[in-house]
């Protein structure tokens, strides 16, 4: 798309600086690099809240300081609340005329990774790097007719809604699995504890050479601790390792440093990086991944909490060998295994659909920079 077809953003937006002088607005929000508003965790005891800025629905906010944010800029559109207050360090702005530019369309542009890179490149400073208001105003973007903007936004929101519905289904299925676990293995049965190592294969990750990590998706995907909760990765390697370091759908993964993230993997075949432990139920034991997951979950989180605040938490082989699984009589064990397997299959299906939908969102955002996508 030629520069002649792009518009200067500063001609369509203006800064807003309304303070909470009468203290009527109490909903204090923060802003994340995932470009979402979230309840603030700041300690506001003794803080003068009248100096905080008010944000109204369909206004936008960004944090000019781009330092230490992982090459991303924190920016968001307030669309879930009528109003809120944010730190006076944040910049609040709005679209001047919604008949020329839709806030939702603009927010889609801000979600593009190209915009993150642009903001980082145009940030200046020594101790802190700042993407200032003038730089934001100089952003060039395509602004099609509002009819076309609404069509693009509608496509994106359709994908967003499907992701939300899948997440709701996952929550429902996991709640069902947890209830089944409590009924089968906790309430009103004669049970015994079996060492985790007796009923599952435990594998610790391989120390891959990080210098070989890249974004070439024709190579082998590699899972690091930060990828556990998202069930996907954007990191790949050419390094070849033993098959025991392969991760498959249904394997339990636990991060061994910092927060002990846990998941039942659903992101497809991948490789297991160091400081991740993989747990796979042994065949013929009628023990499901869900049974293991819920048996050890509370213990893992208690261990994490006991270490937090003193040092960086580390999960050791010694810790793993202390874990045990609650086992029911053989018949109950076998019946529950089938139910857990069905639930797990449904959860994996939902998670895979979320990954595909997210990829479609990324594709739609990428097409915004192409002339054909904005014409109609």
Predicted regions: what they are:
Residues 1-20, 138-207, 326, 330-376:
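Non-catalytic DNA-recognition/assembly elements of restriction-modification systems
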Residues 12, 103-135, 287-323, 376:
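Short, positively charged
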Residues 57, 61-111, 243-300:
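A short beta-sheet element
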Residues 84-89, 124-153, 270-277, 309-337:
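A short glycine-rich beta-alpha junction/loop motif
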């Amino acid at each position: 798309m030629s520069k002649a077809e792009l518009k200067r953003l500063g001609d369509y937006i203006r800064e807003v600086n309304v303070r909470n002088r009468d203290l009527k607005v109490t909903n204090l929000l923060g802003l994340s690099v995932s470009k979402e508003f979230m309840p603030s965790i700041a300690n506001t005891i003794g803080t003068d809240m009248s100096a905080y800025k008010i944000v109204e629905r369909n206004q936008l906010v960004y944090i000019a300081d781009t330092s230490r944010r992982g090459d991303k800029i924190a920016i968001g559109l307030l669309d879930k609340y009528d109003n809120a207050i944010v730190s006076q360090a944040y910049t609040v702005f709005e679209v001047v005329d919604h008949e020329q530019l839709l806030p939702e369309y603009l927010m889609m542009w801000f979600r593009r990774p190209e915009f993150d890179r642009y903001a980082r490149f145009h940030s200046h400073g020594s101790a802190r790097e700042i993407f200032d208001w003038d730089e934001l105003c100089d952003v060039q973007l395509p602004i099609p007719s509002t009819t076309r903007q609404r069509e693009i936004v509608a496509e994106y929101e359709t994908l967003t809604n499907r992701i939300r519905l899948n997440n709701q289904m996952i929550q429902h299925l996991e709640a069902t699995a947890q209830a089944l676990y409590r009924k089968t293995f906790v309430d009103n049965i004669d049970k015994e504890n079996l060492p985790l190592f007796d009923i599952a294969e435990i594998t610790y990750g391989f120390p891959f050479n990080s210098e070989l990590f890249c974004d070439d998706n024709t190579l082998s995907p590699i899972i690091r601790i930060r990828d556990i909760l998202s069930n996907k990765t954007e990191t790949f390697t050419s390094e070849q390792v033993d098959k025991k370091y392969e991760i498959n759908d249904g394997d339990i993964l636990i991060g061994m440093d910092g927060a002990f993230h846990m998941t039942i993997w659903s992101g497809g075949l991948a490789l297991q990086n160091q400081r991740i432990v993989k747990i796979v139920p042994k065949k013929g034991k009628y023990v499901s991944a869900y049974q293991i997951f819920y048996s050890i979950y509370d213990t893992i989180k208690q261990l994490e909490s006991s270490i937090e605040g003193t040092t960086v938490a580390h999960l050791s082989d010694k810790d793993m060998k202390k874990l045990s699984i609650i086992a029911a009589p053989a018949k109950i064990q076998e019946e529950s295994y089938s139910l857990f397997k069905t639930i797990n299959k449904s959860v994996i299906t939902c998670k895979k659909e979320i990954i595909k939908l997210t990829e479609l969102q990324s594709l739609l955002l990428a097409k915004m920079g192409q002339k054909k996508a904005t014409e109609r």
